[in-house]
Amino acid sequence: MSTSHASPRETTEGTVYTVTGGDWDEVVQSAARADDERIVVNMGPQHPSTHGVLRLILEIDGETVTEARCGIGYLHTGIEKNLEYRTWTQGTTFVTRMDYLTPFFNEAAYCLGVEKLLGIDDQIPDRATIIRVLLMELNRLSSHLVAIATGGMELGATTIMIYGFRDRELILDIYELITGLRMNHAYIRPGGLAQDLPPGAVDQIREFVKKMNKNLPEYDKLATGNPIFKARMQDVGYLDLAGCMALGATGPVLRSTGLPHDLRKTQPYCGYETYDFDVPTADTCDSYGRFLIRLEEMRQSLRIVEQCLDRLQPGPVMVADKKIAWPAQLALGPDGLGNSLDHIKKIMGTSMEALIHHFKLVTEGFRVPPAQVYTAVESPKGELGVHVVSDGGTRPFRVHFRDPSFTNLQAMAAMCEGGQVADVIVAVASIDPVMGGVDR
Amino acid sequence: MSDANNTAGDANEVNPEKDLSAENLPGQRGQGGEEIRVQRGMFGANNGGDTSGYGGLVRSVRLPGPASRPYGGWFDEVADELEGALEEQGLLPDNAIEKTVVDRGELTFHIEREHLVRVARTLRDDPALRFELCTGVSGVHYPHDKGRELHAVYHLRSITHNRLIRLEVSAPDGDPHIPSLVSVYPTNDWHERETYDFFGIVFDDHPALTRIMMPDDWQGFPQRKDYPLGGIPVEYKGAQIPAPDQRRSYS
């Protein structure tokens, strides 16, 4: 129970009487006790607005959420355990499936870790690094587009959903051209890339940048000033800087509190320090601020994509060390992507040593010195960290992904409790959790 | 027999001066570092005759060992500040910090588990350290590192000073208790539940240490090394492909 006055020691003006009387607290508490309207509602795991198989357990008093908890784990696939039974190279095939909306970030973070363990991080060819940055920034666009599209749809704004998925489709087309797949690429490999950009890719990306520069203002026109959109988003899902720090929230959630923390600026990797871009922030700590940040980050990503295209020079996309570089002379055959016929002709027909080398590297893989490293990249959702441990073998000893969706989702309770039921959906959407990343 | 092996080992000792690719060889640390396992044989075959000829292979798996001063860069500053701050609290740094490892540009403090919470609180609150963001905990299971089988690894980020350090704490399999850091870093709530779920490390004083990924009634801790991956053999183009954990292993 609170005291009814502040003592002279606590003030500069003598005893100050406050209006929070003990009676009032008692009245409120007894009213809450007498209330039998409190119910516990399970939202999900199959609810259309919970972003995948997320179960929200809400204790509701009328329209007010008094307690909120998450039930997760429905999408756990044991990826970290599976990695311990594959070679280091095969690992990318698994990690790309974690947060399936940010595959290139998962691959890049993992590969940067493996390369750091191998001590070859300074030998990665420039072209490979630039293509990695290019793909990561395209991926940031496509991830934010989904965040905005599905977030809008959960508010009932179907137009913004259609717009978002329309533009994301353009990016998926680029992925398909470059990697052969719309998701689950396994394109970034330890040491470089699986293969070089195909002919026509640069032109298509340039075309896309042009189109996207035209399309992005549409989101502004549709949503940014829209009174209904603002009414639903502003002051909803509030989490301030102290809350973010305590709960480990990063990414747009953290930047919406005004702290311009972005690993691309503070701990640059892949040469981000040489690119020209801004880190947008907001000072509202709410869902609307996070929406504005995502919108601005997409513009900044387009800037980086353009700079990448200008920098691309012909060259190798894999380290020169033949003990690590997967013999990735890939070509597109009638049955999909595979070893090129020329390469097969060479290893089967003329060089037995090349065959042995190919066989050893593909079946056994390369050894990684025993040690542990932590590498982190700024994924669209926040700090994506990878803790990689090697015991000197051809397989990872332990790989742990610190997925930003997992960590940020913890903040759900802090954002939702005391608010309206309808605002829970907005708050969760503003975190942008992807259950593939949360559960792994 | 053992003498013969030793002489063979000496003869095969890699000379980094001569062999430029020595750093790529698995046994490069020689006697330095921290031995976590001794590997015998190859391909995971340990019954039957030594048909491959690799059966006599003995390899010591060593993680990087303790570093000596100076650590380089800002590492010394952090180590000094941490030791000083602990001393101020009447805690002998040598009692709390088991060893300090510097490897691949990363600084690791191995902390005695009973002092973990105090060290973490110091790292968070001391203005010269100010590691305000914890990126969670990752468990590692070293089944052959007797007495220190279970490791909990924390990465702490200082946004104020733009630094990253690692804390490592170990616990024996028989007594898998490590104090919880939730009171210092609330973000570790779910991370510790995850590590408990997968490794069975019991984080004492965690507000609600329950399984988070696996079903509540699950038996065992899936990411321990002695927990099988599972899987069934599949037929591909007429051949039986064994389950992933039954395939030949080169590690």
UniProtKB/Swiss-Prot annotation, chain A:
<dbReference type="Pfam" id="PF00346">
    <property type="entry name" value="Complex1_49kDa"/>
</dbReference>
<comment type="function">
    <text>NDH-1 shuttles electrons from NADH, via FMN and iron-sulfur (Fe-S) centers, to quinones in the respiratory chain. The immediate electron acceptor for the enzyme in this species is believed to be a menaquinone. Couples the redox reaction to proton translocation (for every two electrons transferred, four hydrogen ions are translocated across the cytoplasmic membrane), and thus conserves the redox energy in a proton gradient.</text>
</comment>
<dbReference type="InterPro" id="IPR001135">
    <property type="entry name" value="NADH_Q_OxRdtase_suD"/>
</dbReference>
<dbReference type="GO" id="GO:0051287">
    <property type="term" value="F:NAD binding"/>
</dbReference>
<comment type="similarity">
    <text>Belongs to the complex I 49 kDa subunit family.</text>
</comment>
<keyword id="KW-0472">Membrane</keyword>
<dbReference type="InterPro" id="IPR014029">
    <property type="entry name" value="NADH_UbQ_OxRdtase_49kDa_CS"/>
</dbReference>
<keyword id="KW-0874">Quinone</keyword>
<keyword id="KW-1003">Cell membrane</keyword>
<dbReference type="GO" id="GO:0005886">
    <property type="term" value="C:plasma membrane"/>
</dbReference>
<dbReference type="InterPro" id="IPR022885">
    <property type="entry name" value="NDH1_su_D/H"/>
</dbReference>
<dbReference type="GO" id="GO:0048038">
    <property type="term" value="F:quinone binding"/>
</dbReference>
<keyword id="KW-0520">NAD</keyword>
<protein>
    <recommendedName>
        <fullName>NADH-quinone oxidoreductase subunit D 2</fullName>
        <ecNumber>7.1.1.-</ecNumber>
    </recommendedName>
</protein>
<dbReference type="GO" id="GO:0050136">
    <property type="term" value="F:NADH:ubiquinone reductase (non-electrogenic) activity"/>
</dbReference>
<dbReference type="InterPro" id="IPR029014">
    <property type="entry name" value="NiFe-Hase_large"/>
</dbReference>
<comment type="subunit">
    <text>NDH-1 is composed of 14 different subunits. Subunits NuoB, C, D, E, F, and G constitute the peripheral sector of the complex.</text>
</comment>
<keyword id="KW-0813">Transport</keyword>
<keyword id="KW-1278">Translocase</keyword>
From Swiss-Prot, chain B:
<dbReference type="GO" id="GO:0008137">
    <property type="term" value="F:NADH dehydrogenase (ubiquinone) activity"/>
</dbReference>
<comment type="similarity">
    <text>Belongs to the complex I 30 kDa subunit family.</text>
</comment>
<keyword id="KW-1278">Translocase</keyword>
<dbReference type="InterPro" id="IPR010218">
    <property type="entry name" value="NADH_DH_suC"/>
</dbReference>
<comment type="subunit">
    <text>NDH-1 is composed of 14 different subunits. Subunits NuoB, C, D, E, F, and G constitute the peripheral sector of the complex.</text>
</comment>
<dbReference type="InterPro" id="IPR037232">
    <property type="entry name" value="NADH_quin_OxRdtase_su_C/D-like"/>
</dbReference>
<keyword id="KW-0472">Membrane</keyword>
<comment type="function">
    <text>NDH-1 shuttles electrons from NADH, via FMN and iron-sulfur (Fe-S) centers, to quinones in the respiratory chain. The immediate electron acceptor for the enzyme in this species is believed to be a menaquinone. Couples the redox reaction to proton translocation (for every two electrons transferred, four hydrogen ions are translocated across the cytoplasmic membrane), and thus conserves the redox energy in a proton gradient.</text>
</comment>
<dbReference type="InterPro" id="IPR001268">
    <property type="entry name" value="NADH_UbQ_OxRdtase_30kDa_su"/>
</dbReference>
<dbReference type="Pfam" id="PF00329">
    <property type="entry name" value="Complex1_30kDa"/>
</dbReference>
<feature type="region of interest" description="Disordered">
    <location>
        <begin position="1"/>
        <end position="34"/>
    </location>
</feature>
<keyword id="KW-0813">Transport</keyword>
<dbReference type="GO" id="GO:0048038">
    <property type="term" value="F:quinone binding"/>
</dbReference>
<keyword id="KW-0520">NAD</keyword>
<protein>
    <recommendedName>
        <fullName>NADH-quinone oxidoreductase subunit C</fullName>
        <ecNumber>7.1.1.-</ecNumber>
    </recommendedName>
</protein>
<dbReference type="GO" id="GO:0050136">
    <property type="term" value="F:NADH:ubiquinone reductase (non-electrogenic) activity"/>
</dbReference>
<keyword id="KW-0874">Quinone</keyword>
<dbReference type="GO" id="GO:0005886">
    <property type="term" value="C:plasma membrane"/>
</dbReference>
<keyword id="KW-1003">Cell membrane</keyword>
